[in-house]
Amino acid sequence: MHDKKTELKTVVQNIKDIANTFFPSGKVVDIVDNKIAHLTATLPYPFNEELQGIANSSGIPLGEIVIFNIFYEIFTVCTSIVAEDKTGKLYHARNLDFGLFLGWDVKNNSWTLTRELKPLVVNLDFQRNNKTVFKSTNFAGYIGMVSGVKPDLFTLTMNERFSLDGGYVGIFEWFLGRRDGMWMGFLTRSVLENATSYQDAKEKLAKTRLLAPAYFILGGKNSGEGCVITRSRTATLDIWDLDIKKGTWYVLETNYDRWKPPLILDNRRTPAMKCLNQTMQENISLPTIYDVLSTKPVLNKLTVCTTLMAVYNGHTETYLRECPDPCSPW
């Protein structure tokens, strides 16, 4: 964390500047620095100690580290894909889009926070007894997991799900003392650490009460093991599975329920599905999926990076992205 403290301070300062734009008195930042830090003690081990460790290492106030971790629960706009080729091999990929409405830089024609997050992208290898448990692409300073692969078992990404009963409500309840819901990023990390199979991971993602609604995109190691789990904070609303016999050789999730049309100003789903259909199952691979995720507006000004994963041997690769103009802001 020490190596990334300058970059993390830049991002946290940006978040504070945005807060001060809406609340010029500075009271919001004061509350963050003086009140929210105490709530760290309400988090389960090891998350509470890790947040304190990051604060100590970076020199950033603990409350601001907590807020940095909260932001992922409510400001992400992503595209995730699980696809199976003709031989039964599974691929999992995602565009990580972050920073919606968090400061537009007119001079550089980009989202300020999106640009500042790119130096914080890290590839992590979580080990126990010198053996890899899982691998993940993540932000330095963020203790949850946004994506990961458990070698030879499963792959996992999460996308935010927009809902009236959304992350803001759950976070507010947490501040008020109701803490029976789990943070999305903490759940994905727990599943990557502890789940022993695709089915075990699927069950944990479907049944755990959440702080915010979410989509969990899960891939396994066997033919047909791939799904999108649509979650409210308290229940599973839908599970969309791969079904090769019925012609469903991929599942794709942006940030909208699959049975509803996407927002007209944010339709990444239709172009991505069109590209996948044109690619066809016999040509699907990590390079062709990368091409799909490079198609505008699937690739847009919010895109921080593209991550490609294959469950076999825990393969993962990540590319920082730039979307050349003309390019959609989201």
Regions found by a protein language model. Give the residues of each.
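C-terminus-biased signal that marks the final domain/tail of proteins
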Residues: 1-78, 190-330
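Short, structured patches in soluble enzyme cores that scaffold and shape functional sites
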Residues: 94-96, 138-139, 158-162, 187, ...
